[in-house]
Amino acid sequence: MSEKSGNGNNIKIILLGESGVGKTNLINVSTGRNFEQNSISSNQSSFFEESLEYNNKKYIYNLWDTAGQEIYRSLNKIFLKGSKIVICVYAIDNRPSFQELEYWINSAKEILGDEDQYIRAIVANKSDLFEEQAVPDNEGRQLAEKHKIKFCVTSALCDAEGFKKFLHELIIDYINLIGPEGENALNFKLCEKKPEKEKKKKFC
């Protein structure tokens, strides 16, 4: 594998969502760790570093796990800063976790601002619990279409490779977003897009 790092190195990816939706296990299985059957809900944020090679360049990415309990929401907004990819997770057997997705999507927008600067996605986790499904897949897909973001149905227990593939697609989307010149070029383009305020005409 090439040791040359690409522009946009150290890509911060954050998983948001209610407690118990499986964010920790999604990170575990996508980083080669074991699925924890009796996983305890996270009460703090942590991250794992991984890498991806794309177009002969090596990109480092950090997967951030966050606590979903309401008492930690203000902290999660702090951890959102600097994120380049935001993944909002709900569990298909937990309708309240789906209903809270708007909060998480809006939190990202509040902290990160212009949606052209980062990649967003919705992940429906625990597809293995189809017999207990409380949120039809089409509802998740419709919400993703509403916000013009990607959508994935997966299971940390049964579909580790599927989620990892989706994760890599998001990373490649971000790499293509910033282009060969990196984040500075992206920021320049965004500045160009903002219309200049018309100068007031002065009359003598």
Residue map of PLM features:
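Generic structural signal for well-ordered alpha-helices
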Residues: 102-106
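Generic enzyme active-site microenvironment
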Residues: 63, 89, 123
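Inter-motif core of Ras-like GTPase G domains
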Residues: 72-95, 101, 111
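Post-Walker A helix-loop "phosphate-sensing" segment adjacent to the P-loop in P-loop NTPases
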Residues: 32-40
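Short, solvent-exposed loop/turn segments at secondary-structure junctions
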Residues: 70, 96, 130-131
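Conserved P-loop small GTPase signature centered on TRAFAC-class small GTPases
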Residues: 1-24, 28-33, 51-58, 112-204
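Switch II (G3) loop of P-loop NTPases
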Residues: 59-76
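Conserved Walker B
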Residues: 67, 92-93, 127
